């Protein structure tokens, strides 16, 4: 369904690398990509969604080159850029989006009510708090008609109760999903998901997400490592069952790097 082949993305006047030779294939599964802030996670999703221009490489979606695809309704995302284009309140945005996706708006409106977000319906997206906006975009992306869902930091600024409910919605969804996060606590709940690390625009992996409790990160190269990551922070290696710092013990990728460095 999705084939990303050696894509490179650069930005700014200095043409700084955002993604470097990134390749990933998703066909009938779900993928979690974990990395620190500024590692290229969001850029990758924007590239797949057609919101970021590639400098080289290719992306094929549903068997077609992404540059030839327009108005593809089988893909959805929680990236707010998509919904901010609609200058209308939250309820009208949900109704229009549902019409485009050929589904009943009540499917999303019922979830909004279950998440205690009904007071957001008469407000514009930009008027919502960070957590409210994130949650509404999450619910919009989790349309039952979607075949590929791109989730960028779906748990960011979300309270514990909603995080639990959201995790259930995501893990039970039938679509293929690519989810970016810098948090580790959710990974052990993603049984059957593939896991990749991303640092400085380079993708490393893959593992089973539920295996994260057995993974360790080490400064430098250690014997019997699974793979080595060469980064601007230094050289790191990932090992299984023993090592310097347990990946699952860290709250998020940023704190993990602080511990190991």
Stretches with model-predicted labels:
Residues 105-121, 142:
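Conserved ABC ATPase "signature" region
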Residues 180-184:
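H-loop/switch region of ABC-family ATPase nucleotide-binding domains
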Residues 49:
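Helix-to-loop junction immediately C-terminal to a conserved catalytic motif
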Residues 34-36:
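The feature captures the beta-strand-to-loop junction immediately N-terminal to the Walker
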Residues 149-153, 158:
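Catalytic Walker B motif of ABC-type/P-loop ATPase nucleotide-binding domains
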Residues 77-102:
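Q-loop/switch helix immediately C-terminal to the Walker
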Residues 57-71:
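Conserved ABC transporter NBD signature motif
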Residues 1-23, 27:
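A short, flexible loop at the N-terminus of ABC-type nucleotide-binding domains that lies
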């Amino acid at each position: 369904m999705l084939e990303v082949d050696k894509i490179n993305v650069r930005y700014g006047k200095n043409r700084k690398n955002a993604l470097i030779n990134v390749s990933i294939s998703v066909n009938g599964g779900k993928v979690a990509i974990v990395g620190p802030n500024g590692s290229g996670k969001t850029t990758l999703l924007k590239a797949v969604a057609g919101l970021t221009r590639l400098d080289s490489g290719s992306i094929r979606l549903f068997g077609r080159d992404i540059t030839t695809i327009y108005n593809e309704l089988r893909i959805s995302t929680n990236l707010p850029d998509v919904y901010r284009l609609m200058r209308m309140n939250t309820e009208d945005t949900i109704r229009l989006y549902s019409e485009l996706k050929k589904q009943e708006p009540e499917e999303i409106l019922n979830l909004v009510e279950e998440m205690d977000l009904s007071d957001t319906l008469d407000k514009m997206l930009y008027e919502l708090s960070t957590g409210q906006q994130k949650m509404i975009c999450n619910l919009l992306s989790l349309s039952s008609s979607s075949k590929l869902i791109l989730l960028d930091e779906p748990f960011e600024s979300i309270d514990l109760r909603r995080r639990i409910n959201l995790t259930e919605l995501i893990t039970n969804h039938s679509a293929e999903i690519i989810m970016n996060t810098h948090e580790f606590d959710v990974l052990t709940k993603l049984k059957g998901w593939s896991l990749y690390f991303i640092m400085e625009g380079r993708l490393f992996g893959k593992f089973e997400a539920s295996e994260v409790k057995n993974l360790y990160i080490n400064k430098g190269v250690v014997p019997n490592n699974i793979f080595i990551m060469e980064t601007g922070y230094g050289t790191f290696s990932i090992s299984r069952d023993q090592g310097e710092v347990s990946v699952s013990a860290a709250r998020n990728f940023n704190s993990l790097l602080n511990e190991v460095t």
